[in-house]
Amino acid sequence: MPAAAAAAARTMAARRAAGEPLQYIFGPWPFRDLNLRVDARVLIPRPETEQVVEVALGEARRLAAAAAGAGPGDGAGPGLVAVDAGTGSGAIALALASALGAGVLRQVWATDRSAGALEVAAANVQVCSPMVAGGLPDIELVRGSWLAPLPERLRGHVDLVVSNPPYVTEEEWAGLDREVRTEPRQALVAGPGRTGVPGLADVEAVLEEALLWVGRPGAVVIELAPHQADAAQDRARQLGYDEVRVEPDLAGRPRALVARRSGSE
C-alpha cells in the first residue's frame, strides 16, 4: 500500500476508534437518491427523515393539484414555495427539489441558525444540482431561526413547511451512544414544550411560526418522537390548523406530524 494511502487509513481508523460516525469519516452518504456531504457541523440524515420526506412529497403533490391552473398570490409565477426550516445538510430541501423539480416547485427556502451548517448545505446544493435531470428549482439558503429569516413578501404565500427540528430530551441525550453525541447537540436536543412535554419546544416553535407564513391551502410537516405525537397534535389544533394527523415511520411508530390549513377561513 502506498505510504499516503496507509497514512489516510490510519487516520480514518483513529477517528473511528474515537467514536466518530462512519458518515463523517467517509464523506458523501446516501439520502434517498442523493449522496450528501455530512460532517460534524450537521446532523446525519436518517431513514426516519426519508419517510418524513415521503409524507411531505404527498402534501406537495396534493397542493400542486389543488393549485393547477391558478397562479400564486404574490404574482411571482407558477409553482409551489416550500421551506426546509432548520436545513442542516440540506437533505430535506434537496430531496424535495430533486423529487418534484421545477415543474412543481418554484422555489425552496432552506434556513438554519448555524453558519457551518449552511456551508455544508451550499456544498451539497452545488454538487447535487448537475446530477438532477432538468436541474433543480431555485434553492435559497438563509441564516436564522426557523422561518424568521424569510423575506417579508413570502408572508402568507408559503405552500409547504417541512422540518426536522431537535426533539431529543435532555435525559435521552445523556443516555445516547458516544457516536451519536458527536453530532451537533443543538441539532438534536430541545427543551420542554408549553405543556411541559419533554423535547417538544422546537416542534411547537415551528408550528407557531408557520402560521405567519403558510397560506391557504398549505401544510406543515414536522418530524418528532413517537411519545410526542399526541401533545403535538393537540398543540396544532389549539393553534388553529384545520386538519391534523401523524404518519408512521417504516417501523410503524408515529413520526411525521402533518398540520394543514384549508383553502378558506
Regions found by a protein language model. Name each.
Residues P192, G196-R260:
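Conserved Class I SAM-dependent methyltransferase catalytic core
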Residues S262-E265:
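Flexible, glycine-/basic-rich loop-and-beta segments that form/coincide
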Residues L96, V180, V206-A210:
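Class I S-adenosylmethionine-dependent transferase superfamily signal
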Residues P166-A205:
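Mobile active-site "lid"/loop adjacent to the S-adenosyl-L-methionine
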Residues N35, Q107, D138-E140, D242-R245:
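Conserved beta-strand segments of alpha/beta enzyme cores
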Residues Q51-A174, A205:
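Conserved SAM/SAH cofactor-binding pocket of Class I
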Residues M1-E59:
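Conserved AdoMet
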